[in-house]
Amino acid sequence: MHVVEMMPEVLGAMDKETSGMLRSEYQKRGVNFHLNAKVIEVGKEGVTIEKEGKTALIEAEKVLVSVGRKANLSQVGLDKLNIELLRNGVKVDEHMQTSHPRVYACGDITGHSMLAHTAIRESEVAVNHILGVEDRMNYDCVPGVVYTNPEVAGVGKTEEELKASGISYHAVSYTHLTL
């Protein structure tokens, strides 16, 4: 089995140490990873990839394409309401309110993390705002979970994001063996 990933690491939005641990676990199980690579062609012989300007053929009988999701904004009628859109979804404020004062947006249509935990929290914030309860969306407080074996999860900014922002921090990590 081969995984072709355009990013420098699998699970690019997660902590690099966590992503590397998961990749290492799957390598032990015989999965081959091609990072910083992209698929050029899928043909009868297999998959042609490009990495660092060089092409290579990966022999394959079957191919699973999993390249992410995109908010489906067609046929929703947002144009009739003059709702402002961004490149990846509907523009919302910290209360999940769109540019139309009576329309709120939650879930995949907002173009954020597109995870169930995010959609649930966005919905809570929207309902609270509609009811007059003070609440604001903070994506740093929403967990991200990947249901692999082993499962991985995280919440908050990654160590890399904190370093890049110049924010001081104290890092602690636990594996299932130390809990």
Residue ranges and their predicted role:
Residues 29-31, 101, 167:
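A short helix-to-beta-strand connector/capping loop
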Residues 175-179:
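Conserved small/polar residues in nucleotide/adenosyl-binding loops
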Residues 57-131:
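FAD-site-proximal beta/loop scaffold in flavoenzymes
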Residues 1-44, 48-54, 114-120, 128-161:
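Rossmann-like dinucleotide-binding cores of NAD(P)H-dependent redox enzymes
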Residues 84-86, 133-141, 167-170:
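A short alpha-helix-loop-beta-strand transition element characteristic
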